[in-house]
Structures are given as C-alpha cells and as structure tokens.
Amino acid sequence: MNSKRPVVPEGLTSETRQLAVRPESVEPSGRGHRTRLIMGVVLGSIGSAYAASAPVLSSVVIAFGVAVAIGGGGRLERAASLISALVAGVVGTYLLFGTYEIPMTVVSVLCAFLLAWGYVSDRLRTGWLLLAAAAVTCIMIGIDTVSTSMQGTSITDLVASMVDEAVTSSMGSLDMEGKAVLLETRDQMMAYWPTVYFTVALGIVVCSLFGAWTGARTCMLPVSSDGVYRYDVPLCVAELFAVGVAAQLLGPFLPAWQEETAMVGANVVMCTRIVLAQQGISVLLWRMRERRVAVLFATLGVLSAVWLEMSFALASVVGLLDVVANFRHLPRNRMDLRLWPASER
C-alpha cells in the first residue's frame, strides 16, 4: 500500500521519529531567503509610510515585515529592513503631513523594529516591554512639548483646544443630561491626558509584538503563545502604584502644588492600573488553561474581567496581589524572564 509519509529509518525513538517526520522549522533556501527578505522589506516600508496616519495599527505591519525580513538572517537583513522602513516612513509622512509628524513616525518605526528583532532573536524580557512603552510615552510627550513651544503655546493648551473642539462638535445633538456627562468627560480627559499618551505607546508595543509573532509563524520559525500566560510585571510597577496613591493623598497638604501633585499621582495610578490589569487578566488566562476551559468560555471570562476592571478595578487588584503572591509560581527575576523562552517554543 503506497503512502505519502516519508520513510523513517529503523531504530529511532518515538520522539526522534516525530521530529524526522515533522520538523519544527524549515531553513529557507537561498532563493526563498531572498524572496522573504524582499517581501519583508516591502511590507515594512508600506507600514512605515502610513505610520503617521495610524501609528498603532501600522506597527503590526511594520513588525510583521521586519520579522519576515530578518528571520534567520544577519546584519544585512536587519540593516535593509531598518533603513527601508525609516526611509519609507519619512518620505510617506512628509508627503502626507509635512515635517511635523516625522519624529513620531521615526519613534513608531524604531519601536516596531526593535521589538520584532527582539522577538525573532529570542531576546525579549517582560520588563523591556514596559520600558519600551514608558520610553515611547516620554518621547511622544517630549516631541509635542517641543513642537508646541516652538509655536508659542504649551502642550496643555494643545490638549485643551483639542478636547474643547471635540466637546463643542458633540454638544449640538445632546440633551441637558448628555451635556453634563460630556462636560464631566472633558474634565477627566484634561486630567488624564498623559495616560492617553501611555495608552497609545502601549498599543504600539502590543501591536508590534503581535506583528512579530505573526511574521515568525509565516516564516515557520518556532513560536509560542505562552507569553500571554507568563506576563509578569517588575516589582517597581507596584512601587509606582504606591507612589501615585501617596501623591494623591499628599496633594491637599501641598497648597502651592496641589493641582500638579494630584494630576501626576492620578496619571501614575491610572498607568500602573492598566499594566496591573493586564497581569490580572494573565492570571485569569493561566488559571483557565490549567482548568482546560473551552475557548468560548475563556473569551467570555476575559470580557467579564475587562468589565469588572472598568467598574470595580478588580483585575488590577488581582494583578497587584500576584506581584506579591506569585500565583503562577514564575521566576521572580522579572527583568530576565523571557516571555517566549526557546526551550518552550
């Protein structure tokens, strides 16, 4: 009886027999490698060209292209993907928006490139992701601060004008109760505008990781989804949360700096709450995997956790407790903890 399965030599164990029939990864040939490099460079350039229009979504395409281009390659592939992405990003941004958005494009491209490179080369650590998000946040705020100061205004005035414009355009079709809610939302947006920058930066980081993971799968590189269950923030996040709470409590005792202290404390608490909520959801996913919960019910569980976080901050409380209690029994050297260790891929 004919069979399409390859012939396995005698004397192999069951484990080596499986590896002989279905290898974990396939090394590309010379022609296939060039094709993959060209495809990755083109996709990375396309994503970079539109980085100013949609920095979060474009980071998926950029990281995907970079992962495809440099997967299994060396310095030449990294240089080609980085230079092409930067050039395409600068040219595309200049043609669409002029020079104003070029610095933000460069930041998005560099972030997506570095995270994709770190993922493909198995160098990512959990702490590095948060450092990347914090760095991108500070750079974005710095860019807008310099830009507004060159125009004779401030970043606070810029945010206020944008919020007022959005509120004014939405006022016309609302009743009195809706207008009151909208004005309250305006006050919240004015107080938490730094958190908006952090949310955008975190979106760039997460989408870059997703693009790199998808690109690695496309190139038949060994990948794993265990990073979702191994997400573990550094202890300094809990310390920052405590500092933010302390700043909010000390605000009334510092009359000269009450408004600034309260604003800084509120934004530190909100940013760390977002990060801790992700850890709480990761604990939930880990627990559901241990219990072999079906995908449908796991999805409903995550959606419920998001709702409970928005209503009662429950997920962030679970994440904060996990930082101390280590429910998943993970190694506590978080800055050296790999999200996707090679031994588990």
Where are these regions (language model features)?
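Hydrophobic transmembrane alpha-helices
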Residues: 2-72, 76-80, 84, 292-301, ...
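Small-residue-rich helix-loop
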Residues: 221-275, 279-283
